Amino acid sequence: MKKTIFTGSAVAIVTPMNEEGSINYDNFADRIEEQIAGGTDAIVVCGTTGESAAMTDEEHKECIRFCVEKVAKRVPVIAGAGSNDTAYAIQLSKEAEALGADALLLVTPYYNKTSQRGLVAHFSAIADSVSLPIILYNVPSRTGVNISVETYKELAKKNNIVAAKEASGNISAVAKIAAETDLDIYSGNDDQIVPIMSLGGKGVISVLANCLPTETHEIASYCLEGDYKKAAELQLKLLEFTNDLFIDVNPIPVKEALNIMGKNVGECRLPLIRMEDAKIAKLFSSMEKLGLTK
């Protein structure tokens, strides 16, 4: 029986930046405390939302170390350690394990356009290099490669590959993964928490939780309790805002939203830039309806 890393809601936490572009660790500490106080069940550091692709090696390690220290075992810390370079992904994974992370989130290799056999070889090599439990992250809209159900089945044979973060948007594929593997499944899309959890998913790895940790936790909790009616009502209440968090490339809108809320997380690093005024106005409007504007 594979160990479940968490049930409920995990936040794919943003990395706050100072005006000149350095990481704002004081603000980062505040965001971590806010998440734990809001009921978040796990924290994913150095993921897509955390701008890991724009970090140096040292920053990546320091963010993981800092998060592990501040969380202090109150909830699991899941470290993003994926790369399109297998050797580098192994290095990141070993470093995350040494720094005290509780689990790893490994995105599929991007840009290389490897085959399904290549995905098996890539993830197997990483799994063999560490003892931490691993969540595979499937987000073909960003990486250009999709993990097939057959590949999931093959990778599930590895003892420490325990879960999938599914952001493909393909509910039929999620159903097959649930039916044909023993992997825990987490929704990687905030607008699909209820359908994925109704198929046996264990929770969500969420962008929305950066702004609404309690509500995101409640949606997942209702699902875990079997109250899909309440879960759906809350998910639909937040749907316009949820959609507007992806009105531009993640994490541009969620950082804008947090700044509108007065959290002062700064802007994204280049090559990501602040979105256009019309998009900001649309985001502000959906936030205003929920009472989230300062």
Q: Regions from the language model: what does each represent?
A:
Residues 197-294:
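Structured C-terminal cap/extension of enzyme domains
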Residues 100, 130, 180-182, 199-200:
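Short, structured coil segments at secondary-structure junctions
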Residues 2-11, 15-144, 152-154, 293:
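Active-site beta->alpha loop and helix N-cap motifs at the rims of alpha/beta catalytic domains
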